[in-house]
Amino acid sequence: SYNTKNFIDGQGTIRGVKNGFVLESDQNNSGLAIYVDNAAAVVDHCWFRGAWFDPQTVVWDNIRYGRIADKRPVKGVAPGASVYVPLTLQPGETKTVKVNFCWYLPDSNLSIGGARKVGQAFTGMPCKGTASGQQPVSGFVGKQLLNSFDRGGDGLTGIIQSPEFNIGKRYLKFLVGGGSQADRTSVNLVVDGKIVETAVGNQTETLSETVWDLKPYQGKKAFVKVIDLDVYPWGHILADQFVLTDNRNEDIYNLSSTSTLLADFESNSWGDWQVVDSSEEEKQFLADEGDVEATYRPWYSERFKSLNEVIGYWDANQAMLEKNSRLFSDAFYSSSLPAEVLEAVAANLTILKSPTVLRQWDGRFWAWEGCQDSFGSCHGSCTHVWNYAQALPHLFPSLERTLRETEFRVSQNTEGHQNFRVNLPISAPPHNFHAAADGQLGGIMKVYREWRISGDTQWMKDLFPAVKKSLDYCIRTWDPLHKGYLEEPHHNTYDIEFWGPDGMCTSFYLGALTAFIEMGKELKQPVKEYTALLSKGKKYMETALFDGEYFIQKIQWEGLQAPNPVDVMSFGGSYSEEALKLLKEEGPKYQYGTGCLSDGILGMWMASVCGLDEVLDNEKVRSHLVAVHKYNLKHDLIDHFNPQRPVYACGKDGGLLLCTWPKGGMLSLPFVYSNEVWTGIEYQVASHLMMKGEVEKGLDIVRECRERYDGRVRNPFNEIECGHWYARAMASYGMLQGLTGVRYDAVDKTMYIDSKIGDFKSFISTDTGFGTIEWKAGKPVLNVVYGNIDVKRYNVSGKIVD
C-alpha cells in the first residue's frame, strides 16, 4: 500500500484517478496525482475523519492487520488517502508495483522583488523580533520592534507615522536597521510639512543607534514618518526606541528619568502611531517597474494546461524518459575515475533536482543558493555562488545561457553595474548596493565558456556590448587608475569587501580580461587597452601579491577614491567604538592580509573550467595550491577554534579551512567565515590541484569531504553551507576535467584531453549529446550514447590529433 496525508492543501479535497487518487489544491484541476500500474488497486479516498491523531491511528491499524479500505471520494476535506494492491505470492516469488507521481501546481505565492502589496507593511502589531524567512534581527530594546518585513517579507509596502509632538529637547535618539534607500526605506523627521532629517539602515538586520540634533527645530511641532516603499531585496525597515533627550550620550537601552520615550513598540498595537495612505508616494516606483507577473509560475504551467495533461504525458512517455535517464546513468558510472570523485560529482547532481533550482514559465533558470527547511536560502541566482557550479553548463547548457542573459540584460544597468541577485519573477532589480567583483567578473568568463560550449558565436556577439559595459564598469569602479589589479574596496562571496589588491579577486580580473580579449579578437573589436591591463595585472600578481609560496592580500584603505571604511555601506560593516580602534591599528574589518586563502587563486580555476588559458605563472599557481593543501587541510578539527558555523565540519571531522595564517599576521577580525569548511571550495581546490598534476593531494581533500558525508552524521546527497543542497558544491563537476583534461569546444569542434592519471574512461556531456571519452593506449575513443558530438580534431596535451 501507499499512504499519505493530505499535505497539498489543508482545506482541499481528494478525488479519484485511475488506480489512485489526487490530492487536489483549491485551484481547478491541479494538485498531486498518485496512482499505480495495477488494475487490481483498491483506493481509500478518505481516511477516518477525527481529531488529533485519529486518522493516522486508524489507517495504521488497517496496514498492520492487512485490512483493505475501499472508500469513495467525499465532499469536503479528506485528511488522507491510501492505495492498496492485493497480491498473492508463491515462496520466492517477487512482483513490482510501480507508484506514479504527477505534480501540477501552476501558480504560487512566491515572489522576491516583483510583487507589491501596497499599504500592508504595518498592519497588525509590532514584530516580536525576527520574522519568518528573515535573517536574525538583533540590537533592539525589549521584546518587540517596528519591522516592516514581518507580515510578508520585502513585498509589503506602507507608511506609518508618530503623533505630532513639540520639540523641546535637544536630541532625538533611536535605533534603525534594514534597507538603505532614503527615498524608499527610511525613518524621517517631518517639520512644517517637510522632511528635515532622514536615517536609513545599512542593509543589515542589526539595529544601530542614530542621533538627530534638533536645535534648528526647537519650539516647533514635528512627527516621525517611517516609510517602506521598496519590494526588492532589503526592501524593509527596522526601527525601535525613539527617545527625546538633552543628553547626546543618553543610554538608549537604560533611559534616564529626564528623557522622554516617544515609542518603544512593546504593546500589542501601534498605539497612537498611525498607518497612512502610501499609494500616491508609490506611484513613481510602480511606473518604474513596468509589467511583471506578481508571483512565480513554473515552466510546466505553460507546457501543460492541467494535471490530466501531465498524467497523459507521463503515461505516454515514461518508458522513453526512463530509457534516456538510464543512458545517462550507465554512461556516467562506466567511468574509470576514482570512486570518491564519482561519488562527489553524482551526489551533488541532486541539487539540480532539489528546491534550490526553479525554472519560471518562460523557460529561464532561477535559483536560490540553497534551501532552509521551509524556504529558500539567499535568493536570486547569486553570481558569486553560482560561479563555482560547473554541472549545469555542461549537462543543461541552454539553461545556463539563460543565466548569462539575465545577468547582462536584466540585472545590469546602463552604467554596467550588475546586481548579483535577481528578482523572482525575473525582472530588473534595484542598484542600491555594491556589485560583486568575483560574481561580475566571473560572469564575463562564463559568457566565454557558454560560447565555446554552444558554438553559437552570434549569441556571444549579441551579448558582447553588455559584456564590454560590464568590464568597463569593473575597471572604473575597482581599478580606476588602470593599474591592472583591484584596489578599491570590492564586494565578494564572503559577503564583505576586500580593501586593497588580493589574489582571489584580482585573479578573477585577469581571467575576465583574458576572456574579453579572446571574444574581442573573434569579433575584430579593439582590445589594446585591455591587453595592457592584463599585462600589468599579471606582473603585479606574480610579484607584489606572491610571497614566495602563495598569493596574499595587500590591505589598503588610505589614499583610495573610496571614503573611510566607516562610511561605506557593507553587510554587518558598522564600526563600534571598539572596531574604530581596530581600524586604526589593523585596517578595515574582514580582510585576510598575509593569510593562505583557499580561494586565493580562484579566478585561475575559473579560467581553466571556462576553457581559457591561465595567464599566471603555472609554478606559482601550483605552489599556492600545494600551500593550501599543506596549511589548510586538517585531518581532524578537535583543536580548531571556529566561532562561526562549526556544524559544517567539527570535532573529529577533517576538512579544508577557508583560510589560515601559517606565517602570522592573523587579524583580530578576519573575514567572516574564515574558520569554516565549505565543500564547494574543497572541490575547486581539489580539481585545480588535479589540473596541476597534484592528483593525490586533490584526492586527499575529496576523501576528507566525502567522509563527512558518509551517511552516519550527514546526508550523503545534501552538502550544506548556507542551506541544504547548496549550489557551490557543484564545483565537484570540475574534477572530471581536473583528472582528464577533457573539454569539448563546439566553436572549432575540438576535443581536449590532458590526462593526469594515464589511461582513463570518463563521462562527457556537451550541448548536443553525451557519452564517454577514453584515453587508451595512446589513442582517444569517443562513444556517443545520446545525440551527437561533432569532433574534427583532438588536442591531446597541446598536440593536435586529427
Predicted regions and their residues:
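Short Pro-Gly-centered flexible turn/kink motifs
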Residues: 87-103, 287
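Extracellular carbohydrate recognition and processing domains
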Residues: 190-237
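Extracellular carbohydrate-recognition regions
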Residues: 114-128, 244-286
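Short beta-strands within extracellular/lumenal beta-sheet-rich domains
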Residues: 83-85, 143-168, 207-211
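Aromatic-rich carbohydrate-recognition surfaces in CAZymes
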Residues: 3-10, 16, 22-25, 89, ...
